[in-house]
């Protein structure tokens, strides 16, 4: 879900081409995996699976999107969530219940023969489990792509790496990265391209938001942006009913944040959430190293255990090999 500040971002988004995106991209791994699991499905909403019934949509997404990244001069690093803060538990429970309702709605739509509704509800029912994480990391290792284990929120770690200059930008569909202080956020990187939605095909392009320009345009500081986020709602609190981005911006600019919270939610203490956004748990215990893919290892995993087409897997990996030979291996990996 992320923080609900879309309505004050309209003039701050820059549509990009792939040529604008070369560099090191720190991806919110859980966010990317949810995108893969939601989108990579059959027309009736059924996820891709192997013969044993193991879901493989996320592995397909990692393989083909990563190859696409490398072809375009983007070196990805996947940042995985660690332990969530205690005040996120309510949101986690709500999301679990939402996925369960969506799963039931998917089954109902299938029985009624409504394939469009079935696909929609199936996408909303996507879930990540321990096998999803373990298999994703295994594939990344075989592809030679680094991944980082965050102590807590992956977006916070990615934003920290961007602030330290270790990566070029953070990648997520959510806007939390801005509250966590990422200098640059890129959206739609894992979902860009032509997609079918509501019976029609649309083109989704990557977009970039530069934090300093965003703050200047709004006339606020990052701490004030966090206050805006708290007012409209984040992953850690529901926000104040009826308060959208524009109203929250006015409240914060007028110095009324504390008084509005005291009036509307007298039992709510925003300080722990504010402090978490401004000083989240992060780590320097990681290494960013891109290696040439272990082609036979990838084939053994995806084709031998997950029933992927060997021809498609080898063809995808060959694109990376061809790209690497056009540069030097050292320059690429």
From Swiss-Prot:
<dbReference type="Pfam" id="PF00867">
    <property type="entry name" value="XPG_I"/>
</dbReference>
<dbReference type="InterPro" id="IPR036279">
    <property type="entry name" value="5-3_exonuclease_C_sf"/>
</dbReference>
<dbReference type="InterPro" id="IPR006086">
    <property type="entry name" value="XPG-I_dom"/>
</dbReference>
<protein>
    <recommendedName>
        <fullName>Flap endonuclease 1</fullName>
        <ecNumber>3.1.-.-</ecNumber>
    </recommendedName>
</protein>
<keyword id="KW-0378">Hydrolase</keyword>
<dbReference type="GO" id="GO:0000287">
    <property type="term" value="F:magnesium ion binding"/>
</dbReference>
<feature type="binding site">
    <location>
        <position position="235"/>
    </location>
    <ligand>
        <name>Mg(2+) 2</name>
    </ligand>
</feature>
<feature type="region of interest" description="N-domain">
    <location>
        <begin position="1"/>
        <end position="99"/>
    </location>
</feature>
<dbReference type="InterPro" id="IPR006085">
    <property type="entry name" value="XPG_DNA_repair_N"/>
</dbReference>
<dbReference type="InterPro" id="IPR008918">
    <property type="entry name" value="HhH2"/>
</dbReference>
<dbReference type="GO" id="GO:0017108">
    <property type="term" value="F:5'-flap endonuclease activity"/>
</dbReference>
<comment type="function">
    <text>Structure-specific nuclease with 5'-flap endonuclease and 5'-3' exonuclease activities involved in DNA replication and repair. During DNA replication, cleaves the 5'-overhanging flap structure that is generated by displacement synthesis when DNA polymerase encounters the 5'-end of a downstream Okazaki fragment. Binds the unpaired 3'-DNA end and kinks the DNA to facilitate 5' cleavage specificity. Cleaves one nucleotide into the double-stranded DNA from the junction in flap DNA, leaving a nick for ligation. Also involved in the base excision repair (BER) pathway.</text>
</comment>
<keyword id="KW-0269">Exonuclease</keyword>
<feature type="binding site">
    <location>
        <position position="176"/>
    </location>
    <ligand>
        <name>Mg(2+) 2</name>
    </ligand>
</feature>
<keyword id="KW-0227">DNA damage</keyword>
<dbReference type="Pfam" id="PF00752">
    <property type="entry name" value="XPG_N"/>
</dbReference>
<keyword id="KW-0479">Metal-binding</keyword>
<dbReference type="InterPro" id="IPR029060">
    <property type="entry name" value="PIN-like_dom_sf"/>
</dbReference>
<keyword id="KW-0460">Magnesium</keyword>
<comment type="subunit">
    <text>Interacts with PCNA. PCNA stimulates the nuclease activity without altering cleavage specificity.</text>
</comment>
<dbReference type="GO" id="GO:0008409">
    <property type="term" value="F:5'-3' exonuclease activity"/>
</dbReference>
<dbReference type="InterPro" id="IPR023426">
    <property type="entry name" value="Flap_endonuc"/>
</dbReference>
<keyword id="KW-0540">Nuclease</keyword>
<keyword id="KW-0235">DNA replication</keyword>
<feature type="region of interest" description="I-domain">
    <location>
        <begin position="117"/>
        <end position="255"/>
    </location>
</feature>
<dbReference type="GO" id="GO:0043137">
    <property type="term" value="P:DNA replication, removal of RNA primer"/>
</dbReference>
<dbReference type="InterPro" id="IPR019973">
    <property type="entry name" value="Flap_endonuc_arc"/>
</dbReference>
<keyword id="KW-0255">Endonuclease</keyword>
<dbReference type="InterPro" id="IPR006084">
    <property type="entry name" value="XPG/Rad2"/>
</dbReference>
<feature type="binding site">
    <location>
        <position position="155"/>
    </location>
    <ligand>
        <name>Mg(2+) 1</name>
    </ligand>
</feature>
<keyword id="KW-0234">DNA repair</keyword>
<feature type="binding site">
    <location>
        <position position="153"/>
    </location>
    <ligand>
        <name>Mg(2+) 1</name>
    </ligand>
</feature>
<comment type="similarity">
    <text>Belongs to the XPG/RAD2 endonuclease family. FEN1 subfamily.</text>
</comment>
<feature type="region of interest" description="Interaction with PCNA">
    <location>
        <begin position="325"/>
        <end position="333"/>
    </location>
</feature>
<feature type="binding site">
    <location>
        <position position="81"/>
    </location>
    <ligand>
        <name>Mg(2+) 1</name>
    </ligand>
</feature>
<feature type="binding site">
    <location>
        <position position="28"/>
    </location>
    <ligand>
        <name>Mg(2+) 1</name>
    </ligand>
</feature>
<feature type="binding site">
    <location>
        <position position="174"/>
    </location>
    <ligand>
        <name>Mg(2+) 2</name>
    </ligand>
</feature>
<dbReference type="GO" id="GO:0003677">
    <property type="term" value="F:DNA binding"/>
</dbReference>
<dbReference type="InterPro" id="IPR019974">
    <property type="entry name" value="XPG_CS"/>
</dbReference>
<dbReference type="GO" id="GO:0006281">
    <property type="term" value="P:DNA repair"/>
</dbReference>
